[in-house]
Every structure is written in C-alpha cells, then in structure tokens.
C-alpha cells in the first residue's frame, strides 16, 4: 500500500481568479487567515511534503513553503499547475488540491493512498455526483502524456483521463471537502458560517 510519506502534495494557487475580481484567492483572508493557510493546516498533518504552485505573488506564498510557477505561460488552468507539480515534486506520486477549499478532509491523503493500485496512473476525487478534478493524485509516469496533451493545446481533462488508467476515490460522505470559494460573496457567506 502507498504510504502518505511516499507522496508530495501541491496546493494549486496559480489561477487568474477572475471570479474573485482578479485578487489572488490563496492570499485572501478568511477569519483573519489567508485561504492557503487553512488548506495547509488541514493538509500538513497528513503529508510531510507540501509544495505551492503560484504564478504571481510568489514572495507572499514563500512564507508558506516551496513555490514554483507553471512552465506553460499561457495559463492552461489547473493543468499547468499539475504539469509543473509533476516536474518539481521529488516523489513518484504527486497529489493536488486547490488553494480555496478550506475544509479539506483530514483523511484525504490516506483515502487517495488506499485507492492506489499497481497500474493506477491518476486518481480523482468523486463527491457522489461529480468528479472533482483538482482533488487528484498522479503518478509521475503521466508527465510525458500530460506534456504532449498541453503542447497540442488540449485543455479538457477528461481527454487525458481517457489516455491514462484513471480511477475515482469516493468522497460521497464528505461533500464539504470540495467547498471552494470563488467569489467575494461566497467568501463572505462562508466566513459568517464558519466564524
């Protein structure tokens, strides 16, 4: 069985945050702490290796850990961060979570590790209704396929899943894990609920 210590986890903070008015979501405060700090607090007891993918405000993010940017400069969305994470992480298995989901399960890493089989390439969280493609675990052997995928301009993650041995991890008992805060209104509402 894959152990959590054999994985690295990347917090994806490289997006443009257009729905948040262009403000860097990971650095926006929720209850007096940046969103990324909430994610780190949930993730750090689960894994010794946390990295941050950010394409701006890198000095601010360095306060929280090792930071790297996308290698594809045309912002191919989370796929650019996943690609860069596979390049920079030192482990064969690399997990990914978004910077704007402050309620990540405290057993998220363990669930992913328990679901790995010998031939698994990609694991994706599933909430019972939908796949959650930014809550995912990749084996580094996917990197050549992902590089080719991005170089030809593909952006639909489902196409990559079809090229790889992809399985899903059941989180239907934990829908709050996937609450992400995309707008100032969602942030304000969540802050009131969580205060």
Swiss-Prot record:
Annotated keywords: Cytoplasm, GTP-binding, Magnesium, Metal-binding, Molybdenum cofactor biosynthesis, Nucleotide-binding, Transferase
Pfam family, one: NTP_transf_3
GO biological processes: bis(molybdopterin guanine dinucleotide)molybdenum biosynthetic process
Molecular function, one GO term: metal ion binding
Enzymatic reactions: Mo-molybdopterin + GTP + H(+) = Mo-molybdopterin guanine dinucleotide + diphosphate
InterPro entries in the cross-refs: MobA-like_NTP_Trfase, Molybde_CF_guanTrfase, Nucleotide-diphossugar_trans
Cofactor: Mg(2+)
CDD domains assigned: MobA
Catalytic activity, EC: 2.7.7.77
Keyword Kinase on entry: no
Gene Ontology cellular component list: cytoplasm
Compartments, record wording: Cytoplasm
Main localization (coarse): cytoplasm
Binding positions (GTP): 12-14, 25, 53, 70, 100
Binding-site residues for Mg(2+), renumbered to this chain: 100
Subunit structure: Monomer.
PANTHER family associated with the record: MOLYBDENUM COFACTOR GUANYLYLTRANSFERASE (PTHR19136:SF81)
UniProt free text on domains: The N-terminal domain determines nucleotide recognition and specific binding, while the C-terminal domain determines the specific binding to the target protein.
Family designation: Belongs to the MobA family.
HAMAP family in alphabetical order: MobA (MF_00316)
Entry function: Transfers a GMP moiety from GTP to Mo-molybdopterin (Mo-MPT) cofactor (Moco or molybdenum cofactor) to form Mo-molybdopterin guanine dinucleotide (Mo-MGD) cofactor.
Name of the protein: Molybdenum cofactor guanylyltransferase
Originating organism: Vibrio campbellii (strain ATCC BAA-1116)
The organism's taxonomic lineage, starting at the top: Bacteria, Pseudomonadati, Pseudomonadota, Gammaproteobacteria, Vibrionales
């Amino acid at each position: 069985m894959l152990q959590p210590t054999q994985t690295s986890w990347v917090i994806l903070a490289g997006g443009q945050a257009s729905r948040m008015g262009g403000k860097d979501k990971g650095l926006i405060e929720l209850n007096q702490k940046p969103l990324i700090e909430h994610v780190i607090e949930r993730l750090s007891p689960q894994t010794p290796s946390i990295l941050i993918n950010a394409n701006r405000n890198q000095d601010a993010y360095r306060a929280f850990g090792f930071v790297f940017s996308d290698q594809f400069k045309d912002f191919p969305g989370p796929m650019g961060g996943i690609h860069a994470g596979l390049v920079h992480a030192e482990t064969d298995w690399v997990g990914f979570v978004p910077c704007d989901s402050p309620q990540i399960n405290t057993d998220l890493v363990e669930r992913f590790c328990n679901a790995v089989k010998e031939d698994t390439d990609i694991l994706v969280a599933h909430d019972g209704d939908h796949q959650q493609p930014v809550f995912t675990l990749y084996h580094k052997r996917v990197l050549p396929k992902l590089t080719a995928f991005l170089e030809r301009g593909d952006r639909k993650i489902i196409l990559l899943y079809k090229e790889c041995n992809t399985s899903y991890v059941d989180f239907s008992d934990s829908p709050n894990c996937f609450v992400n805060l995309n707008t100032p209104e969602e942030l304000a509402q969540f802050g009131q609920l969580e205060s």
